[in-house]
């Protein structure tokens, strides 16, 4: 099959593209290669995707004409949409980047799928859509009407837009709410990367909400396994579904939403302890108040995902952090 993987130079997109290539698929990857973080890291990921079955095009999702041309020329079987302007905190200062990439860019993906009869669109949503929810674990049955960041609002909007296109045009869509993904080849703006860099340089790390936070940290290999399994299960329309009695994660249209998380929330301080053990050094900690747009805790109910594909993430934080540190030291030749 021929896949489009958006954000192919990004953390998750790179790993997904690599897995699809290993399984013998043809993959077209796109990425705008922006400088939100180190472009050389993005290029290094792309270099590892070198294969006759992989073709890369530098393209911005918001380029309406370029995206339409790409879809018309390639006639993809399936689309795995992972490109987005990421980061909760960055959205506080750079809101228009999120409107361009996460809203207009996403509309171009939907239009491409519509006009070329793509058989399945799988797209990245986010655990951030749960916003002010306090009930744990977060379930796809819960309300997601109270986001606390613009990033989260754009991800919720993506789910709504997907439903509209599934309803109007019969496009099968599956949204995946990722929970704090980490691992080798990760993003430099994420905590594990920043903490590792600071500790190896002898600098202190900023610990928000004085360490009193929990995250459902999910290792990249587990994310990849789940995504690859999910893309093979194409949602079907369900004429018996109703708003009154049906799940909000499904529809009468061929539309589904799932959580992908480890289902084992970890205290931030325990995450830091795992990093200290992997590095063999103690972190100097700046204890800070919580940042605007952050939530205290996240935890994923992944039973519906397990019911669908028979898989639950397995990797412990201790193992995952150790793997990240080994990659980091090798990549930066430390």
Task: Identify the meaning behind each predicted range.
Residues 1-181, 231, 311, 315, ...:
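N-terminal Rossmann-like NAD(P)+-binding domain of SDR-like oxidoreductases, especially those catalyzing
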Residues 42, 63, 191-192, 223:
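Amphipathic coiled-coil/heptad-repeat helices and related helical stalk/stem segments
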Residues 157, 161, 165, 195, ...:
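Hydrophobic alpha-helix immediately C-terminal to the catalytic Tyr-X-X-X-Lys motif of short-chain
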Residues 185:
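Conserved GTPase G-domain signal focused on the G5
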């Amino acid at each position: 099959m021929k896949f489009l993987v958006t954000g192919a130079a990004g953390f998750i997109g790179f790993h997904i593209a690599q897995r699809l290539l290993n399984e013998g698929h043809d993959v077209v990857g796109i990425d705008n290669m922006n400088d939100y973080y180190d472009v050389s890291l993005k290029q290094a990921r792309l270099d590892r995707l070198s294969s006759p079955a992989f073709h890369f095009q530098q393209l911005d999702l918001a380029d309406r004409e370029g995206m339409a041309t790409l879809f018309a020329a390639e006639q993809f079987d399936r689309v795995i949409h992972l490109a987005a302007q990421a980061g909760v905190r960055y959205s506080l200062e750079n809101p228009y980047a999120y409107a361009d990439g996460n809203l207009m860019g996403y509309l171009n993906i939907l239009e491409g799928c519509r006009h070329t009869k793509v058989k399945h669109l799988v797209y990245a949503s986010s655990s951030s859509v749960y916003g002010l929810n306090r009930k744990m674990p977060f379930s796809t049955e819960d309300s997601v009407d109270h986001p606390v960041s613009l990033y989260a609002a754009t991800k919720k909007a993506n789910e709504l837009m997907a439903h509209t296109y599934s309803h109007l045009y019969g496009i099968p869509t599956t949204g995946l709410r990722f929970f704090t993904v980490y691992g080798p080849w990760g993003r430099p703006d994420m905590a594990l990367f920043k903490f590792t860099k600071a500790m190896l340089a002898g600098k202190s790390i900023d610990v928000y909400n004085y360490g009193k936070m929990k995250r459902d940290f999910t290792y990249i290999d587990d994310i990849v396994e789940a995504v690859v399994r999910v893309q093979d299960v194409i949602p079907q329309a369900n004429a018996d579904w109703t708003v009154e009695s049906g799940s909000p994660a499904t529809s009468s249209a061929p539309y589904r939403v799932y959580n992908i998380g480890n289902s084992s929330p970890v205290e931030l301080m325990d995450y830091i302890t795992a990093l200290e053990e992997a590095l063999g050094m103690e972190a100097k900690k700046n204890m800070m108040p919580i940042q605007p747009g952050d939530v205290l805790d996240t935890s994923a109910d992944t039973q519906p995902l397990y019911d669908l594909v028979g898989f639950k993430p397995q990797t412990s934080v201790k193992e995952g952090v150790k793997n990240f540190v080994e990659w980091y030291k090798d990549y930066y030749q430390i």
